[in-house]
């Protein structure tokens, strides 16, 4: 949400568009992350990442969706999370006349560092939860992967996350 605030603070058309896109993307992606974490907590009866692992082998549908959603959350180009962040940085590069450009350029650097840190902790989470070998405590349990009811709630959010948002004609505000 820091990128939303950065976009609004730039007082530029691209910054305001970035804020709107960022809010929608944040709602969709974070909603999907909460759905997935709730489903995994229900399945495993724990939220301890240290006890999880090998989710792609035990729950391949849930694991694949978790990987996709984490990539969208970290701002992978082409997914919903990217456009709001990228456009907010563009808006901050050249804020409205009269605003302190040094503050905005410093905020751009801070935002870029935050993006790298976000990528780091999301990739660390994916490595601990999705990859590796499943713990012995889960091998003899009857774990259920995503069923049709869960998928029917998640697929619309996946589609909204995968929409490129280029139809918003945001490129016309870049000039």
Predicted feature locations:
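Functional transmembrane alpha-helices
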Residues: 1-143
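Acidic-residue sensor for enzyme active/binding pockets
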Residues: 85, 150, 172
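Residue-level signal for threonine
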Residues: 12, 147, 173
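Single conserved hydrophobic/aromatic residue that forms the stacking wall/gate
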Residues: 167-170, 174
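Final/C-terminal transmembrane alpha-helix of multipass membrane proteins
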Residues: 153-164
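Interfacial loop-to-transmembrane junctions
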Residues: 138-154
């Amino acid at each position: 949400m820091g990128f939303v605030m950065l976009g609004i603070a730039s007082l530029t058309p691209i910054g305001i568009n970035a804020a709107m896109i960022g809010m929608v993307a944040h709602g969709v992606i974070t909603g999907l992350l909460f759905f997935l974490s709730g489903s995994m907590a229900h399945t495993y009866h724990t939220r301890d990442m240290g006890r999880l692992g090998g989710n792609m082998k035990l729950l391949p549908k849930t694991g694949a969706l978790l990987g996709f959603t984490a990539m969208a959350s970290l701002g992978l180009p082409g997914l919903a999370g990217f456009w709001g962040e990228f456009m907010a940085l563009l808006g901050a590069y050249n804020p409205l006349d009269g605003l302190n450009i040094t503050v905005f350029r410093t905020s751009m650097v801070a935002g870029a560092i935050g993006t790298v840190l976000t990528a780091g902790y999301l990739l660390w989470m994916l490595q601990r939860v999705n990859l590796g070998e499943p713990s012995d405590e889960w091998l003899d349990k009857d774990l259920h992967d995503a069923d049709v009811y869960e998928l029917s709630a998640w697929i619309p959010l996946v589609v909204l996350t995968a929409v490129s948002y280029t139809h918003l004609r945001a490129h016309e505000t870049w000039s």
